[in-house]
Amino acid sequence: MGLRVVFMGTPEFAVPSLRRIAAMKPQFETVLVVTGCDKPRRSKNSPPEPTPVKQAALELGLPVLEADDVSSHEFALQVAAARPDVIVVAAFRVLPPEVLELPPLGTFNLHGSLLPAYRGAAPVNWAIINGDAETGVTTFFLQKSVDTGNIITMDRTPIGPDENAFELLKRLSEIGAGTVERTLTMIADGAVMPEKQDERFATKAPKLNRENTRIDWNQPVQRLHDFIRGLALKPAAWTTFGGKSLKIYKAKACAIETAPDEPGTLRIADGRLLVAGTDGWIELLSVQAEGKKAMDGELFARGLRARKEMLRFL
């Protein structure tokens, strides 16, 4: 039997890595998959559903542990019973030292940025929001302080000029599977040369919330475009219109010669829904009004044509 691997993860981002590890037999044996508990995922009233990682693990015939409280001693005992040589983590929770120190070959994490850049919960989103041209994935040994452990290896990739967070996250999950495979091979071969993170280049990627996903229209069009695509499709950038929230999923810079009005002002031109930034206009391509289904910008614009007053997003 090869090295015993315990895998921990929950969302779709972690699934390609789990599948890659499962395919690495006999060099590596996935002895346990730890994930979140079944819960309603479509809406509060929908029936409980398994996590994407649990679904994949069951398809692969792997043993699953649904973890509720990862800080409990009982959880540490359950993981210890699997006798892991190494623990692989991808988009899971913060683990206590009691768990991190169980495997003799260490516990490592797959992170969706080029560390030490974008430490935190939303690295993919903030890389796009900030207009970065490049990002990547990093594997590093976990320690008590979040996202600060020694780097094992990383892979880089360009960010497309119109690529959104949903698309980039999916792409990074596939790239990351290869990074995890290489990391495990390096560990098995004793070829890891851990590198300390340079604190001079450390930046944060804070958790997304209602406040930091609201659009400030008093910005250049390119910044607005990056902000909107950096939050698509979830949780989505939003603004206020007519006293209600409006989610914006997709937009693009609009090349028209007319000078922009006050930032946030709406204009309908040839059926297109335009909004003023500080240096031009941005066209809204996909929106969702509060309590309604998503629709394209042109359809939303049709409902505004009869209104004669100046319309603005706040």
Swiss-Prot record:
Keyword Protease: no
Catalytic activity: L-methionyl-tRNA(fMet) + (6R)-10-formyltetrahydrofolate = N-formyl-L-methionyl-tRNA(fMet) + (6S)-5,6,7,8-tetrahydrofolate + H(+)
InterPro entries, per the entry: Fmt, Formyl_trans_C, Formyl_transf_N, Formyl_transf_N_sf, Formyl_transferase-like_C_sf, Met-tRNA-FMT_C, Met-tRNA-FMT_N
GO MF annotation list: methionyl-tRNA formyltransferase activity
A Pfam short name: Formyl_trans_N
Binding site for (6S)-5,6,7,8-tetrahydrofolate: S113, L114, L115, P116
EC number(s) recorded for this UniProt protein: 2.1.2.9
UniProt keyword annotations, A-Z: Protein biosynthesis, Transferase
Record-level GO cellular component terms: cytosol
SUPFAM superfamilies attached to this UniProt entry: FMT C-terminal domain-like, Formyltransferase
Gene3D superfamilies per record: 3.40.50.12230
Domain of life: Bacteria
Family membership: Belongs to the Fmt family.
UniProt function note: Attaches a formyl group to the free amino group of methionyl-tRNA(fMet). The formyl group appears to play a dual role in the initiator identity of N-formylmethionyl-tRNA by promoting its recognition by IF2 and preventing the misappropriation of this tRNA by the elongation apparatus.
Protein name, UniProt field: Methionyl-tRNA formyltransferase
